[in-house]
């Protein structure tokens, strides 16, 4: 959750959410996994890649035993190359390897090496939405929010990165 836990779209940074979890039989390396989405408003791929690299390097690479695999829900001809923005965290000691039927960058770190697929796919989608509900009690707010989250999470590909959130996203702000 670390890499998706910082609300930041309102200040022009990448935002993320967990779409769901995968069984061992559903991942390339046979371990439990999570499907995570990252979003940035607009169509500036270079800025998105730069911002995404922060999330990966600061919140995923530093966790022991992590691998990042591409997991697009639909085929895409657009992708981000990971070597320049993440792979070189190996300070020249990184290398590429073919494992699990994928081309991976192996980044040597303390416990053990971090691996990330050479290319991660880009897809377009709709980002940001608000569900407003009016309640008379705090308990009703939480119960209504839980029901809304359950409904959102039952939709394939949908994420609710902030669970029940007291703030609403907007495309621009006067006070970041």
Segment roles from a protein language model:
Residues 33-41, 128-135:
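Short cationic amphipathic helices and targeting signals
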Residues 25-29:
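Long, compositionally biased intrinsically disordered regions
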């Amino acid at each position: 959750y670390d890499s998706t836990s910082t609300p930041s779209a309102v200040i022009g940074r990448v935002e993320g959410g967990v779409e769901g979890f995968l069984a061992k039989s559903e991942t390339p390396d046979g371990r439990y996994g999570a499907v995570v989405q990252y979003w940035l408003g607009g169509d500036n791929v270079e800025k998105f890649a730069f911002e995404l690299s922060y999330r990966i390097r600061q919140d995923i690479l530093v966790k022991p035993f992590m691998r990042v695999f591409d997991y697009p829900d639909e085929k895409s001809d657009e992708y981000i190359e990971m070597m320049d923005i993440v792979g070189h965290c190996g300070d020249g000691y990184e290398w590429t390897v073919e494992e699990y039927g994928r081309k991976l960058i192996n980044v040597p770190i303390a416990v053990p090496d971090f691996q990330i697929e050479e290319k991660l796919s880009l897809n377009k989608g709709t980002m940001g939405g608000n569900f407003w509900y009016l309640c008379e009690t705090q308990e009703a707010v939480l119960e209504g929010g839980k029901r809304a989250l359950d409904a959102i999470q039952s939709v394939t590909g949908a994420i609710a990165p902030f669970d029940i959130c007291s703030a609403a996203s907007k495309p621009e702000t006067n006070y970041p």
